[in-house]
Amino acid sequence: MRNYRSPIGKMTPGVEVDREAPVVRAATVAEGADVAEQHTGVGHQRGARPWPLPRRIATLSVHTSPLHQPGTGDAGGMNVYILEVARRLAEANVEVEIFTRATAADLPPVVEMVPGVHVRHIMSGPLGGLTKEELPGQLCAFTAGVLRAEAVRAAGHYDLIHSHYWLSGQVGWLAKERWGVPLVHTAHTLAKVKNAQLAAGDRPEPKARVIGEEQVVAEADRLVANTKTEAGDLIDRYDADPTRVEVVEPGVDLARFCPASGDRARAQVLARRRLDLPERGYVVAFVGRIQPLKAPDVLIRAAAALRQRDPALADDMTVVVCGGPSGSGLERPTHLIELAAALGITDRVRFLPPQTGDDLPALYRAADLVAVPSYNESFGLVALEAQACGTPVVAAAVGGLNTAVRDEVSGVLVDGHDPVAWARSLGRLLPDAGRRAMLARGAQRHARNFSWDRTVKDLLDVYGEAVAEHRTRLSDFATCSR
């Protein structure tokens, strides 16, 4: 491989390092896409890998299982990420064993998710009744279960550990020392970032989590960030070594999330019938866990503000809130229903449980707009899924949403969470069919730049580099010890 200086300062052999920027692994230009519309403008392309693929990976996901339904409890975008990545790693002949906490008595110890991917349930604490915030007290039991599972294997069974979220990173830190393999870590969310952008009345993340994240950042061989924004947070807020931070953008299942064939208006009507939504008028959908961080209340308040601004338009709009309570939202599971009643817009708000199978793409196609008003997102898979279905997104201009949505191309980014500002954006977009059609076309083009196949290709580069560097350190140590 030719030595060169990356445009953003990646350390390559024999080259001076720019410590102010991480690596961005950019996608190649999608077939038929406009180069000017590519979401990532920096990075480097690689030829054949100069290192072997890892044979087997231990994936750690303490607090949530990829088998759980996204949109309920603690299951969300991270579940989708782990599931989609594991499937495609198996297709690339890399075995994946996912370790997660057992949460029900009827769960088998091991589930084969697809050939080459196994989910192993680790007994650690009570099966039910523990919140994510209470799980640090069970990390010792979980770690013991992981180490015992590996102890019956032949030495060198795993080539690498990939931990997800800080709880798993703590387990991975110990396992990497015990097994003598590199640790790759993806944070998915960061306490310091969440605490800097708290919703009103939401609980701040505890100091113990901040300390735990700092420890994992210091110990991981590679840190995978979803976007350049998250990479910057790791470097600036957690003092991560930029040469160990790699940006690998998540993807979307373009076969599942795609525009309906045929006439769009007819397809929208059919999707609304499927979900028992009004066939006429406008539909604005929120999809996600019901918790202050995701800010579904901002959308409901915006609907009420729109009624003050344009009563006729507001009465022609239905807000759909799709998801289940999670996190601090569990403390007030009926809060949004009560809020809609207090604002006098109960007749304009519909609540749906998390959607599975073909019903989730149908919901995106049924909507005229999908709203993502979160206070923070490391990426925002919902925004990407909606755009892949050809539905423009109105999103808060925070975190990874600045990457997931291209402002005025695939949707609209709103500064802040003022319901009046959100009502203004909705009021401008909904009646303007021409502008929404333009954004719908841009949304499809933008989403085509993301795929899980590309994500896994880039992750394999990260894995290979981590394994190669680890083996070099071992070789150097052995040489020095002679």
Swiss-Prot record:
Which positions does UniProt annotate for 1D-myo-inositol 3-phosphate binding? H63, D74, A75, G76, G77, M78, N79, K132, Y165, T189, R209
This protein's superkingdom? Bacteria
Tell me the keywords, alphabetical order: Glycosyltransferase, Magnesium, Metal-binding, Transferase
Q: Which reaction does it catalyse?
A: 1D-myo-inositol 3-phosphate + UDP-N-acetyl-alpha-D-glucosamine = 1D-myo-inositol 2-acetamido-2-deoxy-alpha-D-glucopyranoside 3-phosphate + UDP + H(+)
UniProt binding sites for UDP-N-acetyl-alpha-D-glucosamine: Q69, P70, G77, R289, K294, Q355, E377, E385
Q: Which top class of enzyme applies to this chain?
A: transferase
Q: What is its EC number?
A: 2.4.1.250
Gene3D superfamilies, per this entry?
Glycogen Phosphorylase B (3.40.50.2000)
* Parts of the chain that traverse the membrane: none
- Note the SUPFAM superfamilies from the entry: UDP-Glycosyltransferase/glycogen phosphorylase
Is Glycosyltransferase among this UniProt entry's keywords? yes
Which sites bind Mg(2+)? Y364, R365, A367, T391
According to the UniProt entry, its GO molecular function terms are: acetylglucosaminyltransferase activity; D-inositol-3-phosphate glycosyltransferase activity; magnesium ion binding
User: Which InterPro entries does the UniProt record give?
Assistant: Glyco_trans_1, Glyco_trans_4-like_N, Mycothiol_biosynthesis_MshA
Q: Which Pfam families match?
A: Glyco_trans_4_4, Glycos_transf_1
GO terms of biological process kind? mycothiol biosynthetic process
Q: Which family does it belong to?
A: Belongs to the glycosyltransferase group 1 family. MshA subfamily.
This chain's function reads: Catalyzes the transfer of a N-acetyl-glucosamine moiety to 1D-myo-inositol 3-phosphate to produce 1D-myo-inositol 2-acetamido-2-deoxy-glucopyranoside 3-phosphate in the mycothiol biosynthesis pathway.
Q: How does it assemble?
A: Homodimer.
Name of this protein:
D-inositol 3-phosphate glycosyltransferase
Organism per entry: Salinispora tropica (strain ATCC BAA-916 / DSM 44818 / JCM 13857 / NBRC 105044 / CNB-440)
Gene behind this protein: mshA
